[in-house]
Amino acid sequence: ASKKKYGYPKSFFVNWAKNHKEEFINMAKKLYDADVLQSITLSLQTRNEEALEIIKRKTMNINDISFYTDMCKQVGLPYSTELMLGNPGETVDSWKDGYIEVVADGISCDIYAVALLPGAELASEASLKEHGIEYEPVQFPGVANPKYRPVKEWMNQIVSTKYMNRDEMREMFEWTWCTRLGHEFNFTRELAD
């Protein structure tokens, strides 16, 4: 009602719960219909079973992506997903297979690097050692225009694990960038047809 009357809010971005339920789809649909939400993001992280177990997301509802995409299609709600590159347990082959599985279903997919958050189990000394995790501090990407937010924020980004070394991880970022570029701009879709 306020958007119709005042023109605001223009839109906003929502981080949805990781264990989606039908109510989230309905809530997102209401926001979409009110013209304040462009789409819902279904956050997968990975399609690799071993990685899901290591990061303790194996039992999360969101891993049944087709249930949620089917529901979004039924109600006319645009959707996308996110995958995280750098999870322990993820290999070059499992990353490629998982990414291709997601985009082959016609799902637009954003890619992010795994960050070690303070207090998270993955950032513990035991996890770092067990999974051979190496990380580097990097400036937090996309936090807003530095002109308006001069304070730089940093995160510890995973750059290597015992499952995917530094060179392989760099190669997977490059491979994913090229593959995503081709997919999102329909180059590879046209070739596949």
Can you describe what each PLM-predicted range is?
Residues 59-61, 98, 184:
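Residue-level signature of transmembrane alpha-helix interfaces in integral membrane proteins
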Residues 25-26, 96-97, 159:
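Short alpha-helical segments and helix-capping/turn motifs at coil-helix boundaries
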Residues 173-193:
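Feature captures the RNA virus RNA-dependent RNA polymerase
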Residues 44-45, 49-56, 85-93, 105-169, ...:
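Flexible glycine/acidic-rich beta-alpha junction loops that bind and position SAM and/or redox cofactors
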Residues 76, 106-109, 113, 179-183:
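A generic secondary-structure signal for well-formed alpha-helical elements
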